[in-house]
Amino acid sequence: LPDIQEPLFSNLHGEKTPCVIMAAYGNRHYDDTLAQMQYRLEEQGFICIGAIAPVIPHIYSDILGKGRPDEKDIRIIRKFAVEIKKRLETGEQYGFASVKVPGNPLPAPKQMKPVEKSFDRARCTKCQVCVQRCPVNAISQETLQIREDRCLNCMSCVKVCKAGARGYDCSQVADYLEKNYS
């Protein structure tokens, strides 16, 4: 998980509250994400009764995860949902048990590789949808500039910009991922 996730978890509070964790990823690997989420949520009073990591299209590549989730994935997700429903029903009666997930809950921080971003002020309509949709508040409401120290390179701002004012050059990252993971 990015090291800027602190407010997300510190603002959540459970009292032995059951939860389900999910790490959707673009057919490369989700690394330690499930273990990190479980650790942080259980620190906040939750019990992780289920975890799933479905494959979705990769944000940087049109090849990785293309067509996912597919019918087989949907069947697996539905089966998982049925299992979670059963765990919730029996857990209310007998108590909830935490699941074991793969990964290191406290890995060494990884350096984010910056992705070259573009912002065309002439095309920008100043609608501020990018500001509102940025999951980590990395876009200044006043200047509309991206704070690199906060940006996850998730491309959410690019996806929601109807004017086409925002862009990312992720070709080098996509090339690497496609060569090594497709």
Predicted regions, residues:
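FMN-binding flavodoxin-like domain, especially the glycine-rich phosphate-binding loop
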Residues: 1-114, 169-172, 176
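Short, surface-exposed acidic/glycine-rich loop or hinge patches that mediate macromolecular interfaces
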Residues: 24-27, 124, 151
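Iron-sulfur cluster-binding cysteine motifs and their immediate structural context
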Residues: 119, 125-146, 152, 156-173
